[in-house]
C-alpha cells in the first residue's frame, strides 16, 4: 500500500526496524532530562490527526472497522491532556491486509521524525528475540528499555510486530506498564502508546467475512461485535501467541482489538493503482490486470479473497512493468 507524508501526499519507502540495545540509559541526555521534568514537554510528539485520517481514507483499502477504531481511539487519547492509561491497540488479520501499514502511518503522523524518531520503538521477534532459551535476558532487557525510554519521555510509541512469534512469557513484563496506575520516579507512563500486531484471528475474521458474503451482506455491515469475541478466543487458545500467560487480555488492558478484513479483487486493484501513483506512473490497464491475474484468491470455489492481501503488489508491479 502506498504511504503519504503529512498533508496526505505521497512519500518515500519506510525505514527498517529500529535496533534494540540492552541499556536504554545510555541514550538519555540533558534534553531528555528536561523533558522528564517539564510538565508540558511532549518531546517530538506532533500529532497530525487530519493527515492520518486523510491517508487512511485514500490508501487503506477495504478496512472500514480498522479506520474507524484507530481514528476514534487516537482522537480520544490525543485530545485528553491527562489520560487515565496508555493507549493499547492490538491489530489482527490476514497477511497483507494493512496492519503494518497502519502502524507505520501512526508513527509518521504522531511523531515529527516518524519511524526515525527516538521516541518510536519497533520490535521484531526474529530480530530482537530470536532465541527462546534467552527469555530471561530478553525480559530484563525489554523492561529496562521500556522503563528507561518512558522515563526519558512519556510520549513514546512501542510497536510489537509478529506477536504470533514472540517467545511465550516475554510480554508479561509489559503488563505493569499498560494499566492505569504505573508511575515511577515521578514520571507518568499514561501518555505512551503500545501497538501489537499479529495474524492470529485472521482465519476467524476471514470466515466471518465469507459468511457475510454468502449471506449477501455488504462487508461494511460487518460489526466489531461479531469479530472481537472470535479474535479474543483465537488469541487465548494459542499457546504460542505473545499474549499467552501474560494476563494482558485477561485483565482487559487492551483498549481496542482492531480487525483487518480479507481483501477482495477490487481492493487489490486499489492497491495496484496506489502503488503506480507512488511510483509516479500513469495507471496502465495491462499492468493492473496482469497483477490481478497473477494473484491467488481463496476459497477455491468462490475465489473471493486475496491469499496475500496487497503484500506482494509492489514486487508484482515491478515484474510486469
UniProtKB/Swiss-Prot annotation:
ATP binds at residues 93-100. Keywords: ATP-binding, Endoplasmic reticulum, Glycoprotein, Nucleotide-binding, Signal. Glycans are attached at residue 149. One of its GO terms (cellular component) is nuclear envelope. SMART domains: AAA. One of its GO terms (biological process) is chaperone cofactor-dependent protein refolding. Transmembrane segments: none annotated. This is Torsin-2A. Disulfide bonds: none annotated. One of its GO terms (molecular function) is ATP binding. Residues 1-26 form the signal peptide. It comes from Homo sapiens. SUPFAM superfamilies: P-loop containing nucleoside triphosphate hydrolases (SSF52540). It is found in: Endoplasmic reticulum lumen. Belongs to the ClpA/ClpB family. Torsin subfamily. InterPro entries: AAA+_ATPase, ClpA/B, P-loop_NTPase, TOR1A_C, Torsin, Torsin_1/2.
Amino acid at each position: 500500500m502506498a504511504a503519504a507524508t503529512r498533508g496526505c501526499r505521497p512519500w518515500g519507502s519506510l525505514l527498517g526496524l529500529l535496533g534494540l540495545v540492552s541499556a536504554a540509559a545510555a541514550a538519555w541526555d540533558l534534553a531528555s532530562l528536561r523533558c522528564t521534568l517539564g510538565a508540558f514537554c511532549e518531546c517530538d510528539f506532533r500529532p497530525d490527526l487530519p493527515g492520518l485520517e486523510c491517508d487512511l481514507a485514500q490508501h487503506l483499502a477495504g478496512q472500514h472497522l480498522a479506520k474507524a477504531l484507530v481514528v476514534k481511539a487516537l482522537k480520544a487519547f490525543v485530545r485528553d491532556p491527562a489520560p487515565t492509561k496508555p493507549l493499547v491497540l492490538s491489530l489482527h488479520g490476514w497477511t497483507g491486509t494493512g496492519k503494518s501499514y497502519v502502524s507505520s502511518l501512526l508513527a509518521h503522523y504522531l511523531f515529527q521524525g516518524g519511524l526515525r524518531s527516538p521516541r518510536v520503538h519497533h520490535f521484531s521477534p526474529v530480530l530482537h528475540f530470536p532465541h527462546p532459551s534467552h527469555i530471561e535476558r530478553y525480559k530484563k532487557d525489554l523492561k529496562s528499555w521500556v522503563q528507561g525510554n518512558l522515563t526519558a519521555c512519556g510520549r513514546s510509541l512501542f510497536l510489537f510486530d509478529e506477536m504470533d512469534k514472540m517467545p511465550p512469557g516475554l510480554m508479561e513484563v509489559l503488563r505493569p506498564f499498560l494499566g492505569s496506575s504505573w508511575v515511577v520516579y515521578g514520571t507518568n507512563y499514561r501518555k505512551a502508546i503500545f501497538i501489537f500486531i499479529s495474524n492470529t484471528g485472521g482465519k476467524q475474521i476471514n470466515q466471518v467475512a465469507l459468511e457475510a458474503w454468502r449471506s449477501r451482506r455488504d462487508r461494511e455491515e460487518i460489526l466489531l461485535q461479531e469479530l472481537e469475541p472470535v479474535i479474543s478466543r483465537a488469541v487465548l487458545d494459542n499457546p504460542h501467541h505473545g499474549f499467552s500467560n501474560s494476563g494482558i487480555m485477561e485483565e482487559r488492558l487492551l483498549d481496542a482489538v482492531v480487525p483487518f478484513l480479507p481483501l477482495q479483487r477490487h481492493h487489490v486493484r486499489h492497491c495496484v493503482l496506489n502503488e503506480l501513483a507512488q511510483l509516479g506512473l500513469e495507471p496502465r490497464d495491462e499492468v493492473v490486470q496482469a497483477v490481478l491475474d497473477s494473484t491467488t484468491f481463496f476459497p477455491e470455489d468462490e475465489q473471493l479473497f486475496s491469499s496475500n492481501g496487497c503484500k506482494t503488489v509492489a514486487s508484482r508491479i515491478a515484474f510486469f512493468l
